[in-house]
Amino acid sequence: MRIEKCYFCSAPVYPGHGMMFVRNDCKVFRFCRSKCHKNFKKKRNPRKTRWTKAFRKSAGKELTVDNSLEFEKRRNTPVKYNRELWSKTVEAMRKVESIKHKRQARFIMNRLKKGKELEKAADISEVKKNIHLIKAPHAGQAKQLEDKMVQKLAEDVEMDE
Protein backbone atom coordinates (compact mmCIF):
# COMPACT_ATOMS: atom_id res chain seq x y z
CA MET A 1 0.00 0.00 0.00
CA ARG A 2 1.54 3.29 -1.11
CA ILE A 3 0.55 6.48 0.68
CA GLU A 4 0.92 9.47 -1.63
CA LYS A 5 1.33 13.14 -0.68
CA CYS A 6 -1.15 15.84 -1.61
CA TYR A 7 0.42 18.15 -4.20
CA PHE A 8 -0.99 21.28 -2.57
CA CYS A 9 -0.90 20.78 1.20
CA SER A 10 1.44 17.74 1.57
CA ALA A 11 -1.13 15.78 3.59
CA PRO A 12 -1.13 11.98 3.18
CA VAL A 13 -3.50 10.63 0.52
CA TYR A 14 -4.49 7.04 1.21
CA PRO A 15 -5.53 4.60 -1.56
CA GLY A 16 -9.11 5.18 -2.68
CA HIS A 17 -9.20 8.74 -1.32
CA GLY A 18 -8.69 12.15 -2.83
CA MET A 19 -8.52 13.20 -6.47
CA MET A 20 -5.93 12.81 -9.17
CA PHE A 21 -5.34 15.29 -11.99
CA VAL A 22 -3.13 14.19 -14.90
CA ARG A 23 -1.83 16.93 -17.16
CA ASN A 24 -1.19 16.52 -20.91
CA ASP A 25 2.52 15.97 -20.26
CA CYS A 26 1.65 13.02 -17.95
CA LYS A 27 2.50 14.95 -14.77
CA VAL A 28 0.33 13.56 -11.96
CA PHE A 29 -1.13 15.82 -9.26
CA ARG A 30 -2.85 14.18 -6.28
CA PHE A 31 -5.10 16.10 -3.92
CA CYS A 32 -6.37 15.03 -0.52
CA ARG A 33 -9.61 17.06 -0.60
CA SER A 34 -11.62 19.42 -2.77
CA LYS A 35 -10.18 22.44 -0.94
CA CYS A 36 -6.71 21.63 -2.28
CA HIS A 37 -8.04 20.83 -5.76
CA LYS A 38 -9.95 24.13 -5.96
CA ASN A 39 -6.92 26.13 -4.82
CA PHE A 40 -4.78 24.36 -7.44
CA LYS A 41 -7.33 25.19 -10.17
CA LYS A 42 -7.26 28.84 -9.03
CA LYS A 43 -3.46 28.72 -9.53
CA ARG A 44 -2.75 29.57 -5.90
CA ASN A 45 0.81 29.15 -4.70
CA PRO A 46 1.08 26.62 -1.83
CA ARG A 47 4.06 28.54 -0.43
CA LYS A 48 1.86 31.63 0.01
CA THR A 49 -1.20 29.82 1.37
CA ARG A 50 -0.79 29.97 5.13
CA TRP A 51 -2.28 26.59 6.08
CA THR A 52 -0.04 24.42 3.86
CA LYS A 53 3.13 22.55 4.81
CA ALA A 54 4.99 24.39 2.05
CA PHE A 55 4.18 27.75 3.68
CA ARG A 56 5.23 26.53 7.14
CA LYS A 57 8.55 25.25 5.83
CA SER A 58 9.32 28.31 3.68
CA ALA A 59 8.43 30.67 6.56
CA GLY A 60 10.78 28.79 8.91
CA LYS A 61 8.01 27.55 11.17
CA GLU A 62 8.87 23.87 10.67
CA LEU A 63 12.04 21.82 10.58
CA THR A 64 13.28 21.58 6.97
CA VAL A 65 16.91 20.42 7.02
CA ASP A 66 17.28 17.30 9.13
CA ASN A 67 18.67 13.79 8.61
CA SER A 68 15.56 12.18 10.09
CA LEU A 69 13.51 13.56 7.17
CA GLU A 70 15.68 11.59 4.70
CA PHE A 71 13.99 8.32 5.73
CA GLU A 72 10.66 9.43 4.25
CA LYS A 73 12.02 9.53 0.71
CA ARG A 74 10.18 7.52 -1.92
CA ARG A 75 11.96 4.36 -3.01
CA ASN A 76 10.87 2.52 -6.15
CA THR A 77 13.12 -0.52 -5.83
CA PRO A 78 11.20 -3.66 -4.82
CA VAL A 79 12.85 -5.69 -2.07
CA LYS A 80 12.31 -9.41 -1.49
CA TYR A 81 10.41 -10.09 1.73
CA ASN A 82 12.59 -11.08 4.67
CA ARG A 83 11.08 -11.35 8.16
CA GLU A 84 14.29 -10.26 9.89
CA LEU A 85 14.76 -7.25 7.60
CA TRP A 86 11.09 -6.34 8.07
CA SER A 87 11.32 -6.38 11.88
CA LYS A 88 14.56 -4.34 11.83
CA THR A 89 12.95 -1.82 9.48
CA VAL A 90 9.90 -1.39 11.71
CA GLU A 91 12.13 -0.95 14.78
CA ALA A 92 14.25 1.62 12.91
CA MET A 93 11.09 3.49 11.87
CA ARG A 94 10.03 3.74 15.54
CA LYS A 95 13.46 5.08 16.55
CA VAL A 96 13.53 7.60 13.70
CA GLU A 97 10.02 8.79 14.60
CA SER A 98 10.96 9.34 18.25
CA ILE A 99 14.14 11.20 17.25
CA LYS A 100 12.16 13.34 14.81
CA HIS A 101 9.59 14.27 17.47
CA LYS A 102 12.35 15.31 19.90
CA ARG A 103 14.10 17.44 17.27
CA GLN A 104 10.86 19.10 16.22
CA ALA A 105 10.02 19.90 19.84
CA ARG A 106 13.49 21.39 20.36
CA PHE A 107 13.16 23.42 17.14
CA ILE A 108 9.80 24.82 18.26
CA MET A 109 11.13 25.73 21.71
CA ASN A 110 14.14 27.50 20.16
CA ARG A 111 11.81 29.38 17.82
CA LEU A 112 9.58 30.48 20.69
CA LYS A 113 12.58 31.50 22.83
CA LYS A 114 13.21 34.57 20.62
CA GLY A 115 9.66 35.79 21.10
CA LYS A 116 9.86 35.31 24.86
CA GLU A 117 13.09 37.35 24.98
CA LEU A 118 11.51 40.15 22.93
CA GLU A 119 8.43 40.11 25.15
CA LYS A 120 10.59 40.29 28.27
CA ALA A 121 12.59 43.23 26.85
CA ALA A 122 9.35 45.03 25.96
CA ASP A 123 8.01 44.46 29.48
CA ILE A 124 11.22 45.82 31.04
CA SER A 125 11.15 48.94 28.84
CA GLU A 126 7.49 49.53 29.67
CA VAL A 127 8.22 49.27 33.40
CA LYS A 128 11.12 51.72 33.04
CA LYS A 129 8.91 54.21 31.19
CA ASN A 130 6.02 53.97 33.66
CA ILE A 131 7.94 53.45 36.91
CA HIS A 132 6.01 56.33 38.50
CA LEU A 133 2.86 54.23 38.35
CA ILE A 134 4.50 51.43 40.31
CA LYS A 135 6.58 53.39 42.82
CA ALA A 136 4.95 56.39 44.50
CA PRO A 137 7.18 59.50 44.79
CA HIS A 138 6.87 59.56 48.62
CA ALA A 139 7.20 55.80 49.11
CA GLY A 140 10.68 55.89 50.69
CA GLN A 141 10.17 59.07 52.74
CA ALA A 142 8.32 57.39 55.61
CA LYS A 143 11.33 55.18 56.32
CA GLN A 144 13.66 58.21 56.11
CA LEU A 145 11.49 60.18 58.53
CA GLU A 146 11.46 57.25 60.91
CA ASP A 147 15.26 57.01 60.76
CA LYS A 148 15.58 60.76 61.43
CA MET A 149 13.24 60.51 64.43
CA VAL A 150 15.28 57.63 65.86
CA GLN A 151 18.50 59.65 65.42
CA LYS A 152 16.95 62.73 67.08
CA LEU A 153 15.71 60.64 69.99
CA ALA A 154 19.17 59.10 70.36
CA GLU A 155 20.75 62.59 70.33
CA ASP A 156 18.22 63.87 72.88
CA VAL A 157 18.95 60.92 75.15
CA GLU A 158 22.70 61.59 74.86
CA MET A 159 22.23 65.30 75.63
CA ASP A 160 20.11 64.55 78.66
CA GLU A 161 22.76 62.31 80.10
UniProtKB/Swiss-Prot annotation:
The keyword Transmembrane helix does not apply. GO terms for molecular function: structural constituent of ribosome. It comes from the Eukaryota. Gene3D superfamilies: Ribosomal protein L24e. Keywords: Nucleus, Ribosome biogenesis. GO terms for cellular component: nucleolus. InterPro entries: L24e/L24_sf, Ribosomal_eL24, Ribosomal_eL24-rel_N, Ribosomal_eL24_CS, TRASH_dom. It is found in: Nucleus, Nucleolus. GO terms for biological process: ribosomal large subunit biogenesis. It holds the Pfam family Ribosomal_L24e. Belongs to the eukaryotic ribosomal protein eL24 family. Associated with nucleolar and cytoplasmic pre-60S particles. At the end of biogenesis it dissociates from cytoplasmic pre-60S particles and is likely to be exchanged for its ribosomal homolog, RPL24. Involved in the biogenesis of the 60S ribosomal subunit. Ensures the docking of GTPBP4/NOG1 to pre-60S particles. This is Probable ribosome biogenesis protein RLP24. It comes from Danio rerio (Zebrafish). The gene is rsl24d1.
